[in-house]
Design a protein with these regions (language model features):
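Domain-scale signature associated with acetyltransferase and cell-envelope carbohydrate enzymes
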Residues: 1-134, 138-140, 144-161, 166-169, ...
C-alpha cells in the first residue's frame, strides 16, 4: 500500500530534507538536504555507511552499502552496487551501476555498468564498457583512454543495435556484432 511502508535504522541522521516517502533506510546512514527520496531501499550499516547529500532526487531504486550521492544528482529506476558514488549533477536512469563505481557530471540511461567503472567527464566513458542489445551512446563519448591499461584489451563489446552518437571515439580494440 502506498504511503504506508517506511523504516529508519538505528543511528541514522536526517537533516533538512524535503520529501521522504516509502523508503527503508538502514542503520548509520547520513542524509542532509535531499529534495526527494521516494520508494527506495538505502542499505547502510556501521562498517559501510551510506550518505546522501544536498539536492538529490532519488525515486524507485536500491542503494547499496557504503554508497555516496551528492550535489544535485538525480536517479530514477536504478540499482547501485556497494561503495558506488554519484556526484555533481549526475543522472542515473533505468540503469544498474556496479560495485566500486563513480559517475560524475554526466548522464547514464538504460545501461548495465559493470563494477569499478569511473565516468568523470561529461559524456565520456573512460573504462571498459559492455554495451549489448539495442544500445545508444551519448555524443562525444570516449571509450577507453588509457585509464585502465595502455594495451589493447577489449575496451568495448557492443551487440546488435549499437548506435554511437556524433564524435564518439573508440580507442583500442573493440568487438561489434556482425
Amino acid at each position: 500500500r502506498r504511503g504506508y511502508y517506511g523504516k529508519i535504522g538505528d543511528r541514522t541522521v536526517i537533516k533538512n530534507s524535503r520529501i521522504i516517502k516509502d523508503t527503508w533506510i538502514g542503520s548509520d546512514a547520513y542524509i542532509k538536504g535531499a529534495n526527494k527520496l521516494k520508494n527506495l531501499t538505502i542499505n547502510s550499516e556501521p562498517g559501510a555507511k551510506s550518505q546522501i547529500g544536498e539536492g538529490c532526487e532519488l525515486v524507485n531504486g536500491i542503494i547499496g552499502y557504503g554508497c555516496r550521492l551528492f550535489y544535485g544528482v538525480k536517479a530514477v529506476r536504478f540499482v547501485m552496487g556497494a561503495n558506488s558514488q554519484l556526484k555533481y549533477g549526475a543522472r542515473l536512469i533505468n540503469s544498474y551501476l556496479g560495485d566500486n563505481s563513480t559517475i560524475s557530471c554526466c548522464e547514464v540511461l538504460n545501461s548495465l555498468i559493470f563494477p569499478a567503472h569511473e565516468q568523470h567527464h561529461n559524456n565520456s566513458f573512460l573504462c571498459a564498457a559492455t554495451v549489448l542489445g539495442q544500445s545508444n551512446m551519448a555524443a562525444g563519448a570516449t571509450i577507453g583512454s588509457n585509464h585502465n591499461s595502455r594495451g589493447a584489451d577489449g575496451e568495448i563489446v557492443a551487440g546488435r543495435g549499437f548506435w554511437p552518437g556524433l564524435c564518439v571515439s573508440l580507442k583500442h580494440n573493440s568487438k561489434f556484432a556482425s
